[in-house]
Regions:
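Conserved donor NDP-sugar-binding/catalytic core segment of glycosyltransferases
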Residues: 1-39
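Hydrophobic residues in well-ordered beta-strands that form the structural core
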Residues: 15, 42, 106-108
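A recurrent flexible, glycine/aromatic-enriched loop bordering the glycosyltransferase active site
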Residues: 27, 36-41, 47-72, 91, ...
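A short, conserved alpha-helix in the catalytic core of glycosyltransferases
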Residues: 60-111
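Active-site-adjacent helix/loop segment of glycosyltransferases
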Residues: 100-208, 230
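An extracytoplasmic/periplasmic, membrane-proximal ligand-sensing/linker region
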Residues: 206-229
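C-terminal non-catalytic accessory extensions
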Residues: 222-246
């Protein structure tokens, strides 16, 4: 099915439908999405598969557990960057693809059964890596102009997320992620310069393939909190999108 899709749609990164390996009728991911603030989620995660995601769709990025691409595509984008340990290496790879006009696709006809973060689960180490690596993506993949435009709203999101980290007793990990970014600033700057030289698409074009919402996994909070957070982030994201496009 990947080969058939490639014959039709051409160059790109292709993701299958990920299903849980222990509950084979439950979706793990029907396409991975990036929020304008670099927050990510898996479309359809935790839902019973009744064919609601049996589509072919342009997505923000493909899951690292299984991505299909041609040799030429991989050569253009380059290797996975080792600066991303365990998390967001796939986010970065898909984003870098978009910078080079290489899209990401979800092909539901291909199915892979996947454990899904069995090592760290929702541990403090995972939160640390997710936050640190999210900021590496933001600082290196957005242009400086875009970062300046959305910085005030990014700051609001960060302050809001502090409450979540305090609730989950992971504030220390959040603070550690900031200090880790500071330690990596030289590498981040070098990486950004390299990416800026090769990028083809502007951020205005890139964010067309990003989303505004961010539904927190119910496994980490309750439904009411998830809906409230999603509403606030969606509003801020839409405003950021307007600023980027201005």
């Amino acid at each position: 099915n990947f080969l058939s899709s490639y014959d039709i749609h051409g160059e790109g990164l292709y993701q299958p439908k990920f299903m849980e390996i222990e509950r084979k009728n439950v979706i793990n991911s029907a396409g991975n999405m990036i929020n304008v603030f670099g927050l990510t989620y898996l479309r359809g995660r935790g839902e019973i598969d009744s064919g609601q995601f049996n589509d072919f769709k342009i997505i923000s990025y493909t899951g690292g557990a299984c991505t299909f691409a041609s040799k030429d595509t991989i050569k253009k984008i380059g290797n996975v960057d080792p600066i991303f340990f365990a998390y967001h290496d796939d986010v970065d790879y898909g984003w870098r693809g978009w910078l080079l006009e290489i899209p990401s696709y979800y092909e539901s006809k291909s199915i892979v059964y996947h454990y899904g973060s069995p090592t760290l689960n929702w541990s403090s180490k995972k939160f640390f890596l997710l936050e640190r690596n999210r900021w590496i993506c933001l600082l290196t993949l957005y242009s400086r102009t875009t970062l300046l435009k959305i910085f005030p709203l990014l700051l609001i999101v960060e302050i809001g997320m502090l409450g979540f980290f305090i609730e989950k007793r992971m504030l220390v990990m959040k603070i550690k992620s900031f200090f880790s970014i500071i330690k990596l600033l030289r590498k981040i700057d070098k990486r950004k310069k390299k990416i800026d030289k090769s990028r083809i698409l502007s951020d205005k074009k890139i964010i067309i393939n990003f989303v505004d919402d961010f539904p927190l996994p119910i496994s980490t909070t309750n439904l009411k909190t998830s809906q409230k957070v999603n509403s606030v982030i969606t509003s801020l994201s839409k405003l950021s999108r307007k600023l980027i496009n201005y």
